[in-house]
Amino acid sequence: QTDKVERVIYEKASGIGIGAYTYGQQTFIDEKGDMYLMCTGAYGMNPKYKTGILRIKKGETEFDPTYNWVLNDQTIEGESGKTVWLLQSQYAGNGKMYATMDIPSYWANPTSPNWFTDKSLISVEMDIYNKTVKKLQWRNTRILSCLLLMAEMMWAFIRIILQPAKQARMP
């Protein structure tokens, strides 16, 4: 095994801008062995590049032409705005993923976000198999606070996972 680049692959049909934010889990392999890549879409700053998710099927070396999930026009249950940036994500198993998304309708200046003050970041639960997104009922936050929010999300997820085990031990 080496770190040598063997080849470069492209997916142009969806308009998804390849590249990932440097925090959180930006690629993962699900239980089926398929690899998913979170794409930031130029951090939401250039509408030419969409944010979304691409997949490489197990045993393949190209992006799956049957799966590209553009999130810019995705309906988000519990949220009227649309996203321009899939910021961070964490795969939880069985097609469920928890993530943060930037929603421009919360920007004070509609043409330029202020990531120090705009509370435009929402937390979501995503189903990568059924392509659904649901807003979690947590407060919006600033993008620069997202690392703290991601830690909060993971602790909540851990509590959800451990709760059934705790209840099973109760008399």
Set out the residue ranges of the language-model regions:
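Beta-propeller blade signature
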Residues: 1-3, 49-61, 113-129, 169-170
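Acidic, serine/threonine- and glycine-rich low-complexity intrinsically disordered segments
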Residues: 1-96, 102-104
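Short glycine-/acidic-enriched loop or helix-start segments at secondary-structure transitions
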Residues: 47, 109, 166
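Short, well-ordered strand-loop elements centered on a beta-strand within folded domains, enriched
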Residues: 62-65, 132-136, 167-169
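Loop/turn-rich, solvent-exposed surfaces of beta-rich toroidal or solenoidal domains
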Residues: 80-161
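Blade-level signature of beta-propeller repeat domains, shared across WD40, Kelch, NHL, RCC1
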Residues: 159-171
